[in-house]
């Protein structure tokens, strides 16, 4: 198989692994959502705003929780690809233990970007306030995503 085609299959695998990691993250978030509603999970609020901005051009429908979670899973899959590309840029002979560390750092950077740094932007656009506990749950959930991603990405090698 050509090297280019092999890399495409690796990216598809990374997409799937990103999706699985996002599912793990979502499973972690479910009890907080059940207890506190959408305010208990900051990235679901962020995704709700994104979905709202996308669908309001085509529909008057309100954003449902399933739409928000769907966008959340889509982001997880896409960010799995981004992580794999970043690993490729760092070099090919990275030990699995280092990949786990890189994945946790990567998920921390993702959390810093959204929801932490972009918090006020999404609050204004969505007309809501992110709670401290929702942001804290988001931080923990991003670590679950990074840990899952870091454990699964070496399977592609």
In which residue ranges do the predicted regions lie?
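Juxtamembrane/disordered regions of integral membrane proteins
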Residues: 1-157
């Amino acid at each position: 198989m050509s090297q280019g085609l092999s890399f495409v299959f690796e990216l598809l695998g990374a997409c799937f692994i990103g999706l699985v990691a996002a599912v793990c993250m979502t499973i972690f978030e479910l009890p907080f959502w059940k207890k506190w509603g959408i305010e208990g999970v900051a990235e679901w609020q962020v995704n709700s705003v994104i979905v709202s901005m996308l669908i309001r051009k085509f529909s008057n429908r309100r954003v449902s929780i399933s739409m928000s979670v769907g966008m959340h899973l889509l982001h997880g899959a896409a960010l799995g690809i981004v992580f794999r590309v970043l690993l490729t840029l760092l070099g090919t002979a990275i030990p699995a233990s280092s990949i786990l560390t890189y994945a946790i750092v990567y998920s921390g950077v993702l959390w810093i970007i959204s929801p932490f740094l972009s918090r006020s932007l999404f609050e204004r656009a969505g007309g809501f306030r992110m709670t401290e506990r929702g942001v804290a749950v988001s931080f923990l959930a991003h670590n679950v995503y990074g840990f899952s991603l870091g454990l699964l990405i070496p399977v592609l090698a």
